[in-house]
From Swiss-Prot:
This is Putative acetylornithine deacetylase. One of its GO terms (biological process) is L-arginine biosynthetic process. It catalyses: N(2)-acetyl-L-ornithine + H2O = L-ornithine + acetate. GO terms for molecular function: acetylornithine deacetylase activity; DNA binding; DNA-directed RNA polymerase activity.
Length: 277
């Protein structure tokens, strides 16, 4: 099992390049000094990890530790969790930590509200290998754009790009959005608008915030483009029963109907499905 870091509250610089291929064993342990990690394979050398003064140790002599295990008390560094365990583990950790703060005060919040914020914090990817894509190494791109570009290149038989997920703070996540209207309304308005003007950016108004600023309908519910031209048909006896009988497809049809017309034959006369006049 390969990994480049061990989880410690403050990681010493010499441990950041450590690579361990299997489980490690805590052999020698002395409080307030250090503990030695001995890999099971002979390829790796012994590593001494300093113990921060005043920290409670979570392992004992002879214990086996593996990738991502916490060696002393304290909070995890979110960047270490992202590098070692991946974005899914970091997502769960951040949601859990935020919920713990609210629950201690007797406040109950649905996870989905926090998950929306965390998702925006983990939406960017740093390009490590551009492959045959249009990206540049060390470029920070949106995760969805990254996947879309890789799919296009793979269909053409090219080499996809490689990237590393990055954790952004709330401020940076808000300023790095694709919409410059949304970014300018948050912070650094002059800088954001000047940068957008110099680069000739185009805002496609895909999100909620930018549409509210402009005064357009938000792209949600009946505000979505595919629902804007629909006319609601007149409710008549049997309409709901027929709609449920066909699995609700009638009310989700994206055609324009006349009031009182049949969803199947679009006539105002006898319905072909129900024999109704």
């Amino acid at each position: 099992m390969n990994f480049s870091k061990l989880v410690v509250r403050k990681m010493p610089a010499h441990l950041q390049k450590l690579t361990v291929k299997s489980k490690t064993k805590v052999k020698s342990l002395k409080k307030n000094e250090y503990y030695t990690i001995i890999p099971e394979t002979a390829e790796q050398e012994k590593v001494k990890v300093a113990i921060p003064i005043g920290k409670q140790i979570r392992v004992r002599q002879g214990d086996f530790v593996k990738r991502g295990d916490q060696l002393d008390e304290g909070n995890f560094d979110p960047h270490d969790i992202l590098a070692i365990k991946g974005p899914n583990a970091l997502h769960e950790y951040l949601v859990s930590e935020v919920q713990e703060v609210y629950r201690l005060q007797g406040v109950h919040i649905n996870d989905k509200h926090i998950e929306v914020v965390v998702r925006s914090m983990l939406r960017k990817v740093i390009i490590t290998d551009s492959g045959d894509t249009s990206f540049v190494n060390q470029q920070q791109v949106d995760k969805f754009l990254f996947d879309e570009e890789n799919d296009r290149v793979e269909k053409e038989g090219g080499s996809p790009a490689q990237g590393t997920p990055v954790l952004l703070g709330l401020t940076k996540a808000s300023l790095n959005t694709e919409s410059y209207f949304s970014a300018a309304s948050f912070q650094e308005t002059t800088k954001v608008l000047t940068d957008a003007a110099i680069k000739g950016k185009t805002d496609n108004l895909m999100g909620l915030k930018e549409n509210v600023i402009i005064g357009h309908m938000i792209p949600a519910g009946t505000g979505m483009k595919k629902y804007r031209d629909i006319e609601v048909f007149k409710d008549l006896p049997g309409d709901l029963d027929w709609d449920l009988a066909i699995g609700g497809r009638g009310r989700r049809s994206f055609r324009t109907f006349r009031v009182g017309s049949c969803f199947h034959c679009h006539t105002l006369s006898t319905c072909c499905r129900r024999g109704r006049g």
